[in-house]
Amino acid sequence: VSHAAAAPAAGSPGAARAWGWVAHLRHGGTTPWSAWTGEAPASGRVLPGAQQLELLRRLNLAASAPLTPDLAHRVLTAAAPGRGKPDLALVGVAGSAHGPRPVDPVTLPADELVRVATSVLAEDVVRIGLPREPRGLPRPWARHHRVAGDPILATAARGALGPRRLGRGRMVVIGAPLDQMLADVWTRRCFERGSGAWLEWLRFWQQRGQLPPRVDLTAVAERHAASPGGVVVVLDPTALPHALGVRRLPPAHRPGADAAELARRIATVVGLLVPPDERAALMSRTVWPRMPVTSMPPVSVPDEHREWVTRAAERMARQLQRAGYPVVGDPAAVAPVLTGETPAPERPDAAVLELAVRMLVDDDWTKEAR
């Protein structure tokens, strides 16, 4: 539960105005604090923090219908997890002389509001729960496969195979340009157990001189080369359906940098509410399919990391050329490529906040898992 940094006495200057603004926001109001003049008696022990109040105002602005009283209450009492400021008092309301200075809520950076929003969204995730496991009778006559490699491409492939054709069988390791695979690993981690921020995560692997295990294609293939059914590395996307024994594959869904960052932050809070394995299941099976599509491109490898990625890709290509197992496609296909897209901003805080607000006011977001 949130506690404001400064709890004014009921009769202190500005307190009645502040409680009037709280009542205004609870009833769907959108007037900024600086323009508010009405008063009301105290409706609680302490005033909500400026972050919580401003987030509620933004939700009211975005909503097509009044928010439910429950959602408004949850926003006003939500904690602001992660690194950042404690709950802040409103400027113009007398309070404690200690602690952070009071603020005009409209001037708060987007990141401060995202902290509150992720707390509410994480509670939603736990309450929604997991969807039902897909069922299907096994097909003993059908070829079964296991899938590894690029985690976003592998997720799409598993979806195309379905539970009846996944299991013991040949391991299909799916590769792509290494810069794309790195972006896909980080993005998928955001929708599983969480991760460090994108650039911090890249620096971690560069400093270690290693690749994340899921996209170290040669290491993955060598682990499974002697297993029943063997292994094949597929680098040609046009050959992947044949390798999996399907007619076609749906296009892989790559969330934008804003969606991945919001998921990363939600995962951090979900991890405080449920055990690690349950968090991974909730993030990958509940949040992943429900996350709205945005116009922002996925994260991309910045110029300062491109030399390291290029060298790692060249090394991987040489290893694949000498491989003692089938490789479908040109090993040079793992070389990093420039997408030509405008890269996503390093800190897409404003877009992350916009997405969080969009989700919180969408009734479909909180529909029970099916």
Give each language-model segment a name:
Residues 1-370:
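Anion-recognition interface
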